[in-house]
Design a protein with these regions (language model features):
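Juxtamembrane boundary at the C-terminal end of a transmembrane helix
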Residues: 295-304
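Membrane-embedded alpha-helical bundles of polytopic integral membrane proteins
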Residues: 2-244
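Interfacial loop-to-transmembrane junctions
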Residues: 263-285
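Hydrophobic alpha-helical transmembrane segments of membrane transport and translocation systems
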Residues: 287, 292-295
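Juxtamembrane interface at the ends
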Residues: 184-185, 189-190, 258-266
Length: 304
């Protein structure tokens, strides 16, 4: 029975209200993040990005723990912190090539550590293989993909005075990704009839998917129109291609986390912010849009 106050039945939280809570919380958090990014204090930006990334990784392994799936959470957290710190240092102070080498070295060290750690546990059927697989998947899916947000800041050449210019592309990334989420919800709520993948996410529709692509494309073109100097390496063709690509990747990122939550029997990955859930719910779409934008900038826009 629903809880009552003075004899009145408490009204259930509607889907619309949940979306509004989630949207407001997301905007509030990323507004703070962008203020820090644009403050010019690169170390402050790193601390914020690292905190969100490590929290997302911790809560991901928490979902596995809730299902009883074995993993080496602490080992992954330590390696994740090293990866984030090293990538920030090499990208901001040394160079891109050295950053790649460092990242590969961390992954190699992580594999060696996980195998060595597993050797001291007893062999129980396929438990060792599952433990190592779950641990490695968590680091790659959450932290390795998430780390591309930092890379985007530094993949764009600095200004002549040495100032970082890549923060505008992080703003672009977040805005286009979140407009995709918004477009999927609004369009799906208004005209959604045909289910997209109901066994993973019953509420998502093909109409919502089309709305996500439309909103992300319009957001991409709109941002280029509003900030032509700040997004100087992009042109309208890039904006259209990225708008469609990032919108598609955002939907896949959202569905990917829904798949993981259904597999682990968890509704929300945590209680990081009202209406959002956990940190993985906050960054799920960005896990695929961030690397996509990075590689597009590096291999298409900024290619020699």
């Amino acid at each position: 029975m629903s809880a009552t106050v003075d004899g009145a039945t408490a009204k259930p939280i509607t889907k619309k209200l949940t979306f509004l809570f989630r949207f407001a919380s997301t905007i509030a958090l990323w507004s703070v993040a962008l203020l820090i990014i644009f403050s010019g204090y690169e170390i402050a930006f790193f601390c914020l990005i690292a905190a969100i990334g490590l929290l997302a990784l911790w809560e991901f392994y928490g979902m596995l723990d809730a299902k009883g799936l074995p993993n080496f959470k602490i080992t992954a957290m330590l390696c994740g912190a090293i990866m984030l710190s090293g990538s920030f240092y090499y990208y901001s102070k040394v160079g891109v090539a050295q950053s790649y080498d460092f990242e590969m070295a961390v992954l190699l060290g992580f594999l060696l550590t996980v195998f060595t750690r597993q050797m001291f546990d007893s062999l129980r059927d396929d438990a060792p293989l599952r433990t190592m697989a779950y641990t490695l998947f968590g680091l790659l899916y959450v932290l390795w993909l998430y780390n591309f947000i930092t890379k985007i800041v530094y993949v764009v050449p600095r200004a002549p005075d040495g100032a970082v210019q890549g923060q505008f592309y992080v703003l672009y990334l977040i805005a286009v990704t979140k407009f995709s989420d918004m477009g999927a919800y609004i369009t799906g709520s208004l005209i959604g009839r045909h289910k997209l993948i109901p066994h993973i996410s019953p509420g998502k529709t093909w109409e919502g998917f089309a709305g996500a692509l439309a909103f992300s494309s319009l957001a991409s073109l709109g941002l280029l129109y509003l900030m032509p100097k700040q997004l100087a390496v992009l042109n309208p063709t890039h904006a259209i291609v990225l708008g469609l690509s990032l919108g598609f990747a955002a939907v896949i990122g959202d569905l990917a986390e829904s798949l993981i939550k259904r597999s682990t029997g968890v509704k929300d990955s945590g209680n990081f912010l009202p209406g959002i859930g956990g940190a993985p719910d906050l960054v799920d779409s960005l896990l695929f849009t961030a690397p996509l934008l990075f590689f597009y900038l590096r291999l298409v826009v900024l290619a020699p």
